[in-house]
Amino acid sequence: MSEQFLYFLQQMFNGVTLGSTYALIAIGYTMVYGIIGMINFAHGEVYMIGSYVSFMIIAALMMMGIDTSWLLVAAGFIGAIIIASAYGWSIERVAYRPVRNSKRLIALISAIGMSIFLQNYVSLTEGSRDVALPSLFNGQWIVGSSENFSASITTMQAVIWIVTFLAMLALTIFIRYSRMGRACRACAEDLKMASLLGINTDRVIALTFVIGAAMAAVAGVLLGQFYGVINPYIGFMAGMKAFTAAVLGGIGSIPGAMIGGLILGVAEALSSAYLSTEYKDVVSFALLILVLLVMPTGILGRPEVEKV
C-alpha cells in the first residue's frame, strides 16, 4: 500500500472513532427535540459527569487491587450510566418540566443555567485542573505499513467501535419493539394526541432524558479513556459538536444523529490531517452551514408541516 493511502486510512479510522462518540451524545439532543421540540443545552455536562464518575470508580477499584481492564471499564460504564441517568432525570424535572409550556427562550435560559451550574459544581467538588486517567487498553493492530508509515487500529478504538455499535443496536431494538419505545415514537409523532390516547407523556419525556443521559455517559467513559484526560469544561465543546452532528443529520432523527456524528468526526480528522488542527472546528461548523443551505432540515430530517 502507498504511504498516502495508509495515511488517509489512518485518518478515517480516527474520524470514525471520534464520530462514534459524537453520535452517542447527539442521540440525547435529537430524542429530546423530537418529542418536546426543545434543545437540552445541559446535555454536554452530563457527558462530562459520566467521565468523572467512571474515573472515580476505576481509580477506587484499582486502589483495591483490581487491575483487570475489562472489569474496570465495565464497572465504570455501569456507574457512569446510573449516575448520569439520575442527572438526566433531574435536569428534566428541575430545568424543563416547570417551563415546558412557557416560551422557548425561557427554556433555553433554564438549560444554559443548568449547564453553568453543573460545570461549576464539578469544578468546586473535583477541582478545575485536568485529571489524568489510567490507560487500560494499550494494544494495537497494524492494518498496513510502508517504509515510513503504518496504519493501525488501537485496542481503544476497537472498544469504542464495538461499544457504540452495541449501544446503537440496543437503542434501535428498544425504540422499535418495546412498549415504551413505541410510546416514545408516538409522542415524537404527536405529543398531544399521544396524551389523549392515554400515554403518560411526562413519563415518556423523562425516559427520553434518561436514555440520552445514558448514551452521553457511555461516550464520556469512551472518550475519557481515548484521550486520557478530563476536566469540568470538556462538556461544552463536546456538546456543541454533538449538537452540530444532530442538526447535520436531521435533528429529531436517531439514524440522522448517527450519520451526522460519523460525518462530523471524519471531517474533523481529515481537516486536522491535511490542513491544520486549528481548522477542524472551522471545517465542522462550515460543513453544517453548507448542508443546511442545501437541505435545511438536515440529511434525514423531515420538514415540519403546519397543521390547520
UniProtKB/Swiss-Prot annotation:
PANTHER family: BRANCHED-CHAIN AMINO ACID TRANSPORT SYSTEM PERMEASE PROTEIN LIVH, HIGH-AFFINITY BRANCHED-CHAIN AMINO ACID TRANSPORT SYSTEM PERMEASE PROTEIN LIVH. Residues 1-21, 67-70, 126-154, 225-246, 302-308 are cytoplasmic. Part of the binding-protein-dependent transport system for branched-chain amino acids. Probably responsible for the translocation of the substrates across the membrane. Residues 43-45, 92-104, 176-203, 267-280 are periplasmic. The keyword Cell inner membrane applies. The chain crosses the membrane at residues 22-42, 46-66, 71-91, 105-125, 155-175, 204-224, 247-266, 281-301. One of its GO terms (molecular function) is L-phenylalanine transmembrane transporter activity. It is found in: Cell inner membrane. GO terms for biological process: D-alanine transmembrane transport; L-alanine transport; L-isoleucine import across plasma membrane; L-leucine import across plasma membrane; L-valine transmembrane transport; phenylalanine transport. Pfam families: BPD_transp_2 (PF02653). It is a multi-pass membrane protein. The gene is livH. The keyword Transmembrane helix applies. This is High-affinity branched-chain amino acid transport system permease protein LivH. GO terms for cellular component: plasma membrane. Keywords: Amino-acid transport, Cell inner membrane, Cell membrane, Membrane, Transmembrane, Transmembrane helix, Transport. Belongs to the binding-protein-dependent transport system permease family. LivHM subfamily. Its main location: membrane.
